[in-house]
Amino acid sequence: MSKALIKFIRLSPTKARLIAREVRGMNAELAMASLKFMPNKGAKYIANAISSAVANGGFEANEVIVKSCRVDAAAVLKRFRPRARGSASRIRKPTSHILVEVAKAEVKAEEKKTVAKKTTTTKAPAKKTTSTKKATVKKES
């Protein structure tokens, strides 16, 4: 298992988490190919982190899977924008840390599962119940 950490990316963590969720558990080569065609800014950074994690472990991209892809909030840059009547409003420029872990893909042999037959019993049809109340007749006057 190998890791790669990219710090202080000028990107909102919530936007980057949407992309990280897509590649989690995928083959690294397939993940980088799909990130290449995503229009989002964070896709480029996450693809860079995946390729860096693969290189850190000395693996080939087709033999590892993305075990975890985590995006954490980093420091927020705060700026001010002048507004009307001498006031100012705050502009938040969020940054994020991207951590990617890749691990060798485990080859699992398929196990045959024996499925037990379900025994079904036939139920007797439900009986109609009659009410014991007498019908009340309205008298017309």
UniProtKB/Swiss-Prot annotation:
GO terms for cellular component: cytosolic large ribosomal subunit. GO terms for molecular function: rRNA binding; structural constituent of ribosome. One of its GO terms (biological process) is translation. Residues 117-134 have a biased composition (Low complexity). Gene3D superfamilies: Ribosomal protein L22/L17. It comes from the Bacteria. Keywords: Ribonucleoprotein, Ribosomal protein, RNA-binding, rRNA-binding. CDD domains: Ribosomal_L22. Residues 110-141 are annotated as: Disordered. InterPro entries: Ribosomal_uL22 (IPR001063), Ribosomal_uL22_bac/chlpt-type (IPR005727), Ribosomal_uL22_bac/org-type (IPR047867), Ribosomal_uL22_CS (IPR018260), Ribosomal_uL22_sf (IPR036394). Part of the 50S ribosomal subunit. This protein binds specifically to 23S rRNA; its binding is stimulated by other ribosomal proteins, e.g. L4, L17, and L20. It is important during the early stages of 50S assembly. It makes multiple contacts with different domains of the 23S rRNA in the assembled 50S subunit and ribosome. PANTHER family: CHLOROPLAST 50S RIBOSOMAL PROTEIN L22-RELATED, LARGE RIBOSOMAL SUBUNIT PROTEIN UL22M. Belongs to the universal ribosomal protein uL22 family. This is Large ribosomal subunit protein uL22.
